[in-house]
Swiss-Prot record:
One Gene Ontology term, aspect cellular component: ribosome
One example GO MF annotation: rRNA binding
Assembly: Part of the 30S ribosomal subunit. Contacts proteins S5 and S12.
A single GO BP: translation
HAMAP family (alphabetical): Ribosomal_uS8_B
NCBIfam families in the cross-refs: PRK00136.1
Primary role: One of the primary rRNA binding proteins, it binds directly to 16S rRNA central domain where it helps coordinate assembly of the platform of the 30S subunit.
UniProt-listed InterPro entries: Ribosomal_uS8, Ribosomal_uS8_CS, Ribosomal_uS8_sf
Record's protein name: Small ribosomal subunit protein uS8
Superkingdom, taxonomy of origin: Bacteria
Family under the similarity heading: Belongs to the universal ribosomal protein uS8 family.
UniProtKB keywords: Ribonucleoprotein, Ribosomal protein, RNA-binding, rRNA-binding
Biological source species: Trichormus variabilis (strain ATCC 29413 / PCC 7937) (Anabaena variabilis)
Length: 133
């Protein structure tokens, strides 16, 4: 099944795998999904990323992280902000803070995909892709 919004598809797959307490989940590999997964890994929300599949159909294998002996997911929520039908942009002065700094906003800037903190540090604005906390 082809997804028009690959970012929303990725977030939904991660959310569903978290609720079902799966170790890993498969996400279609695109430049955008690779970049978002890399940011999530750098921020400590997911354990590791690897790729599988042939040249035509590559998938990212995302290993999820859990905490405690009840295996509570580290990712409490994933929320898509900018959608294909309604793009949301933010300048450097108005970058959102997610839950007062506890969560992160993933921003697409002219220097690549990064967190809201990194965009603030580099004095950049851009498209607000999603919130993670």
């Amino acid at each position: 099944m082809a997804a028009n919004d690959t970012i929303a598809d990725m977030l939904t797959r991660i959310r569903n795998a978290n609720m079902a307490r799966h170790q890993t989940t498969l996400v279609p590999a695109t430049k955008m999904t690779r970049s978002i997964a890399k940011v999530l890994q750098e921020e400590g929300f997911i354990a590791e990323i690897s790729e599988e599949g042939d040249e035509v159909k590559r998938n990212l294998v995302i290993a999820l992280k859990y905490k405690g002996k009840n295996r509570q997911p580290l990712i409490t929520a994933l929320k898509r902000v900018s959608k294909p039908g309604l793009r949301v942009y933010s300048n450097r002065k108005e970058l959102p803070r997610v839950l007062g700094g506890i969560g992160i906003a993933i921003i697409s800037t002219s220097s690549g995909i990064m967190t809201d903190r990194e965009a603030r540090r580099q004095n950049l604005g851009g498209e607000v892709l999603c919130y993670v906390w």
